[in-house]
């Protein structure tokens, strides 16, 4: 068992030091805690299973992976779970779990008072975001992916592997797959006036991401170039200011242990067909670590 983290990067440093001594790692905390753990585990020489018990204000990744909010239920699902290899992002050499972003509201998570987050939870993020509506400005960007070049001014950019960002589940286009090696990218064009801003926000809330106000695509690698330094956010934490950013998808880089469900079903079937997993008589999937364990 690892001690409780006392400060930022405390969990990261402890896992880097001794994480590979364990057969499995289980953490409890918010998205920031999960991000620290994954960053540390991406430095490991071997893939060690990760169990996650959400205990933060928003818990975007837990929502995406259908991990229960109740801690005891989440712990039970880890015990009874199957392995699921999840894509991780790489941002100019840094790792992130579920989202990299720039522009409007992306700094709300780390700019919102921790006291308010502890007291009001997700509502604290919403209140902070509303205060920023009148200060929204666009960033001139050159975006390149898969041989395509997109140039324009954008108030928001999200490169994600999640169905929930800041607790909002409708901003990301449908069809998210957590292990396909692809990001979902959403770029929100800079509105020309207050009316267009209002229309853009309404369309985002309703998940009507039309070509007039949005650019959406899937990709395994994308670059962003800007004249001015642009602040970026990684998993709700500051990712620094950059004029050039390269983001790559590290396909199936982290192994979660999750309850068998629609998310894990396809990967479980592939593992069974490859002989990496068998099904018990009651239909429960079991991972085979040593092929000699299987009797002829």
Roles of regions detected by a PLM:
Residues 1-28, 35, 39-40, 73, ...:
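ATP/NTP phosphate-donor binding region
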Residues 38-41, 63-65, 170-171, 199:
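Short amphipathic alpha-helical segments
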Residues 43-159:
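Catalytic core of DAGKc-family lipid kinases
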Residues 101, 105, 158-174, 238:
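Glycine-rich phosphate/pyrophosphate-binding beta-alpha loops
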Residues 106-108, 151-153, 165-168, 193-196:
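Short acidic/glycine-rich loop or secondary-structure boundary segments that cap or lie
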Residues 116-123, 165, 173-195:
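Gly/Ser/Thr-rich active-site loops/lids in small-molecule metabolic enzymes
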Residues 137-139, 153-155, 179-184, 218-220:
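A generic structural signal for short beta-strands and their flanking turns/coil linkers
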Residues 145, 151, 177, 187-296:
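ATP/nucleoside-binding phosphotransfer catalytic cores, i.e., glycine-rich phosphate-binding loops
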